[in-house]
Amino acid sequence: MLRYLTAGESHGPQLTAIIEGLPAGLKISDESINCDLARRQCGYGRGGRMKIERDEAQILSGVRWGETIGSPVTLCIVNRDWINWQEKMSPNARHRDEKIRVTRSRPGHADLPGAMKYDHRDVRNILERSSARETAVRVAVGAVAKAFLASFGIEVNGFVSEVGGIRAERRSLQLERMKELSAASELFTYDAEAEERMKAFIDGAREAGDTVGGVVEIIASGLPVGLGSHVQWDRKLDARLAMAVMSIQAIKGVEIGLGFDAARRPGSQVHDEIYYDSTRISRGELSGFYRKSNNAGGIEGGITNGEDIVIRAAMKPIPTLYRPLRSVDMQTKEPFEATVERSDVCAVPAAAVVAEAVVALELANAMLEKFGGDSLGEVRRNYEGYLEYVRAF
């Protein structure tokens, strides 16, 4: 079983993650992790903090000479802005300063419900941890999971498919071409014409003091049939993936395959017919069974069916607006216009990178549940033995 915990506040000294359950012998490096961290900080519409932070992960435990050794892996990302917050975010009681308490909660954030739940009179105790800054360390953990999946020929790729109601058209693009186009895009999208309209929409929102949401699409390819299970509700892979993606800050909806559109179609236009071709095995495919459509998004009954997993997630517009929304001061109960923290206009491209990470983590966990071992070699032997069985089925 693969599990992880993250810790740290947005303006604290660092973000930390501990990963448990990685097999020994997996090659990882801080360079590969930092590549994904850099992608998270890119994207059209990002805010001022991206000019301060240049995220770099440090591997503190569980890795020796570039390979995991079987013990927990610890990662940390230093917050470079900490130098400006040392007293405001100090763990020491001697630095307490009631004059800097934040009592004005912002609509759309965890501020007010969090303060009421934890009996805080200072909203900063909530907003620091609820901030999307936390996703930086989840991207780092996800990069490790992606390295594990890559050793089995499995890829997880994220794209922006919609911004502000402007949709990218995939048409007949194959996955490799989508990857090439999105890598060259400031919005991580594969439709150049739609990208220009998206950027113009973001520019308009910036001028109006507003923010923009959108939709990200995650495609996982190279997966075998049989990950997840139908036997219990909490073992269904689609349920676990949906929870992982919904855990990302500002995500308000998740769909797999056709998703909500399946409710609008007759069954004859929804379910993927099954075919068999024995020559697929000689061509390097994992199974002779296949489907000509993928409306299920690669999962049936909570189990992977051998097709690509396709997930889409809706991200709401960032709630911190430069044209402030109305709220109420927790202490005085007086109305006010919400305070402005540094913020993005559009963080949908970053959400695509974060969604990649959490999906990779859940898939790596499913792989280890199915083919687990103490070393990567043992996991690979179990995996290859299973593939022999599947090819002969």
From Swiss-Prot:
Listed GO CC annotations: cytosol
GO molecular function: chorismate synthase activity; FMN binding
Claim: Plastid is one of the keywords in the record: no
GO BP terms in the entry: amino acid biosynthetic process; aromatic amino acid family biosynthetic process; chorismate biosynthetic process
PROSITE patterns assigned: CHORISMATE_SYNTHASE_1 (PS00787), CHORISMATE_SYNTHASE_2 (PS00788), CHORISMATE_SYNTHASE_3 (PS00789)
Binding-site residues, NADP(+): R40, R46
InterPro entries assigned to the protein according to its UniProt record, in alphabetical order: Chorismate_synth (IPR000453), Chorismate_synth_AroC_sf (IPR035904), Chorismate_synthase_CS (IPR020541)
Pathway of action: Metabolic intermediate biosynthesis; chorismate biosynthesis; chorismate from D-erythrose 4-phosphate and phosphoenolpyruvate: step 7/7
Residues annotated as binding FMN: R129, S130, S131, Q249, A250, G301, K316, P317, I318, P319, T320, R342
This enzyme's EC code(s): 4.2.3.5
Cofactor: binding details: Reduced FMN (FMNH(2)).
Cofactor(s) listed in the protein's UniProt record: FMNH2
Catalysed reaction equations from the record: 5-O-(1-carboxyvinyl)-3-phosphoshikimate = chorismate + phosphate
UniProt keyword list: Amino-acid biosynthesis, Aromatic amino acid biosynthesis, FAD, Flavoprotein, FMN, Lyase, NADP
Transmembrane segments: none
Source superkingdom: Bacteria
Family, similarity comment: Belongs to the chorismate synthase family.
Subunit structure: Homotetramer.
Function comment: This reaction introduces a second double bond into the aromatic ring system.
Protein name (database record): Chorismate synthase
Species this chain originates from: Geobacter sulfurreducens (strain ATCC 51573 / DSM 12127 / PCA)
Gene: aroC
